[in-house]
Amino acid sequence: SINYXNMSNHHMLSTFNLLPVGSNISTWWNFGSMLMTCLALQTITGFFLAIHYTANINLAFSSIMHITRDIPYGWIMQNLHAIGASMFFVCIYIHIARGIYYGSYLNKEVWLSGVILLTALMATAFFGYVLPWGQMSFWAATVITNLLTAIPYLGTMLTTWLWGGFSINDPTLTRFFALHFVLPFIIISMSSIHIILLHNEGSSNPLGTNSDID
């Protein structure tokens, strides 16, 4: 059996494993662990897709067709990655809604780290949406990045810098792919911090009682 007395002496181990939370929590508290499952799924499938993807405006769409048609189990990887992204957002919005309803925002450090995670996730999803370089990808890249031009003085310069030129082109796709590949590792790091902070402070519960009451 697990010796919890010994585990408490190893702070990092106990922080990751032991969550102070009341025994009255419901299904709504499952979505944090479901998000970790989504993150693992997206990282694994994304790695295998990145192996075969070509970040070139003339070849990107063809490389995705190649993945779905010619690569063994490529169609599963592609579909899991696409549907997994949608599930990621379903889970995170339910996770946030539960946090708002039960007052988890009072735990400021955990909440703010979660806000950073949501922002990073939205950025990652946007960059991933552009990668197939279909008609909607081109539209999204143009419209969303054009919002930067609304920034006074610096807007046009920032947009040109992000595009890598005076219009959406090959350099844009290359850097979007690089950002889409790097951001999940930042999300993994931030998730670890989010979990450590949560396990330090303790989770909320439906009755709002102390986390370590039982």
Curated annotation (Swiss-Prot):
The chain crosses the membrane at residues 31-51, 75-96, 111-131, 176-196. InterPro entries: Cyt_b/b6_N, Cytb/b6-like_sf, Cytochrome_b_N_euk/bac, Di-haem_cyt_TM. It is found in: Mitochondrion inner membrane. Its cofactor is heme b. A ubiquinone binds at residue 199. GO terms for cellular component: mitochondrial inner membrane. GO terms for molecular function: metal ion binding; ubiquinol-cytochrome-c reductase activity. It comes from the Eukaryota. Gene3D superfamilies: Cytochrome Bc1 Complex, Chain C. Keywords: Electron transport, Heme, Iron, Membrane, Metal-binding, Mitochondrion, Mitochondrion inner membrane, Respiratory chain, Transmembrane, Transmembrane helix, Transport, Ubiquinone. Heme b b562 binds at residues 81, 180. Belongs to the cytochrome b family. This is Cytochrome b. It comes from Atractaspis micropholis.
